[in-house]
């Protein structure tokens, strides 16, 4: 709610036009009630669809068939299914799942791993490699295991995509990597569950998957009205639309707590510690850092070679003696063995 209220303020007070562009448009207008009687979402008035005949366009762009299987599978079972196909992308919910499936794929042809356990420079290089391999007919087998990082803003096209169960918006984003350029009459996106290994943890991911499971069985997932219904299902189960209690800090004109609100607000909840890894010329930059100290241009360059880990995993790496604090609050992975050229940062003790 506070984010939408900020956009409404820009619109009403400053005359700003806000353009929402996504293949999985959330419901941002009207009044929606949550499970708590006091939890109401007050949306933006007068949102106008700028694409004419939206429903006809969605029909025209149907290039993918969805195959849904909600029965719990193991890593081995999913890896075996993925290995049936030569050009295939499999997207999972966590970095751990990506590593487990990657390790189980057969070592034939090209197999690649994409997750935030790779530093940004490594991710960019791998995405460029994927694009080149998909165009190169001399490499008939290209299998990629990835996390959600490929679901938005990454222009890759596979004839077959696998997507672990999640919210409808994520599934349709994954389907957008399938038969993207219409080379085939129809592509196939398989939706699968890893519940035989573990249940989806409680939280936003669980809520999103439950909202999808509560859609009518005969729903057409590509129909824009189904996406609207999905978001209603998601919102109506919420206890609050203001998780960080921004209303308490910013909505009382007699007591505006901007500093506290700034500290508490996070667009994306993230308790990660950043570690500089040994990739490319990162260690040369670290030596410059030791010699010259912290400068903005240098830190901007080093940001391309960092991996974020949760505090518990950070403590684990410290206990292995794998991390050095080169300057206050700046950490470097000194053990080269802890960063794999295929799967990135390893949290195991080598």
Language-model-detected regions and their locations in the chain:
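Loop/turn-to-beta-strand initiation segments
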Residues: 13-19, 87, 140-143
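SF2 helicase motor core recognition
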Residues: 142-158, 173-181
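A short beta-strand-to-loop transition that corresponds to the Sensor-1 phosphate-sensing loop
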Residues: 21-26, 92-95, 146-149, 165
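Interdomain hinge/linker at the junction between the two RecA-like core domains of SF2 helicases
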Residues: 9, 13, 17, 23-83
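C-terminal helicase lobe and adjacent C-terminal extensions/tails of nucleic-acid helicase motors
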Residues: 11, 76-85, 91, 96, ...
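SF2 helicase catalytic motif II
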Residues: 1-10
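Conserved helicase ATPase core of P-loop NTP-dependent helicases/translocases
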Residues: 119-147
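Amphipathic coiled-coil/heptad-repeat helices and related helical stalk/stem segments
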Residues: 3, 74-75, 126, 146
């Amino acid at each position: 709610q506070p984010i939408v209220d900020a956009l409404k303020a820009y619109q009403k007070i400053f005359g700003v036009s806000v353009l929402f562009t996504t293949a999985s448009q959330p419901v941002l207008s009207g009044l929606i009630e949550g499970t708590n009687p006091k939890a109401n979402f007050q949306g933006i008035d007068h949102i106008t669809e700028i694409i004419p005949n939206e429903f006809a366009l969605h029909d025209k762009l149907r290039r993918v068939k969805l195959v849904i299987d909600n029965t719990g599978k193991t890593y081995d079972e999913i890896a075996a299914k993925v290995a049936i196909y030569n050009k295939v992308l499999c997207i999972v919910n966590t970095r751990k799942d990506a590593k487990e499936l990657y390790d189980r794929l057969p070592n034939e042809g090209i197999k690649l791993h994409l997750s935030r356990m790779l530093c940004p420079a490594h991710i960019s290089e791998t995405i460029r490699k994927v694009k080149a391999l998909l165009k190169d007919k001399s490499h008939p087998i290209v299998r990629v295991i990835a996390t959600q990082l490929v679901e938005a803003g990454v222009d890759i096209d596979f004839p077959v995509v696998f997507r672990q169960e999640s919210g409808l918006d994520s599934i349709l984003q994954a389907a957008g990597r399938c038969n993207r350029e219409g080379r085939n009459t129809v592509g196939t996106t398989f939706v699968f569950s890893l519940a035989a290994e573990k249940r989806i943890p409680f939280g936003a991911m669980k809520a999103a998957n439950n909202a999808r499971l509560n859609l009518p069985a005969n729903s057409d997932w590509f129909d824009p009205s189904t996406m609207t219904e999905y978001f209603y299902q998601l919102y109506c189960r919420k206890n609050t639309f203001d998780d960080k209690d921004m209303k308490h800090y910013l909505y009382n004109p007699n007591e505006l707590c901007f500093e506290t609100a700034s500290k508490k607000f996070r667009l994306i909840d993230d308790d990660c510690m950043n570690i500089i890894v040994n990739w490319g010329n990162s260690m040369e930059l670290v030596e410059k850092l030791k010699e010259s100290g912290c400068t903005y241009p240098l830190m901007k360059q080093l940001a391309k070679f960092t991996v974020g880990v949760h505090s518990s995993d950070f403590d684990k790496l410290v206990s292995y003696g794998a991390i050095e604090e080169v300057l206050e609050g700046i950490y470097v992975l000194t053990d080269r063995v802890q960063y794999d050229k295929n799967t990135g940062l390893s949290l195991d003790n080598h």
